[in-house]
């Protein structure tokens, strides 16, 4: 199986109802979950000219899953709790990871 990184992007949200749904989603995808990942906070942007910015993109976390192809990952992610607000502000970006 191939491995894929899920990047969670959207406005920062305090722990709440959607966060409580994550364990159920992790259980639902079962063996497809390779790395539960981690939330991200307090980022910094370092540019090639040496300048910095303490306002990085709205990247909130990541997970790693395994599947036969990206279409299977899309099916796994369609009901992810991070997308539950359903207003388009939240997204999960999917990237295939090369074999090591």
Where are each of the predicted segments found?
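Conserved, structured core segments of small domains
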Residues: 1-100
């Amino acid at each position: 199986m191939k491995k894929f990184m899920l990047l969670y992007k959207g406005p920062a949200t305090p722990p709440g109802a959607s966060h409580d749904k994550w364990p159920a989603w992790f259980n639902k995808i079962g063996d497809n979950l390779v790395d539960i990942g981690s939330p991200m906070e307090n980022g910094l942007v370092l540019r090639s000219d040496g300048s910095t910015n303490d306002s990085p993109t709205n990247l909130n976390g990541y997970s790693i899953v395994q599947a036969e192809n990206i279409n299977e990952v899309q099916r796994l992610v369609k009901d992810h709790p991070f997308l539950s607000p359903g207003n388009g502000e939240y997204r999960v970006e999917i990237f295939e990871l090369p074999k090591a």
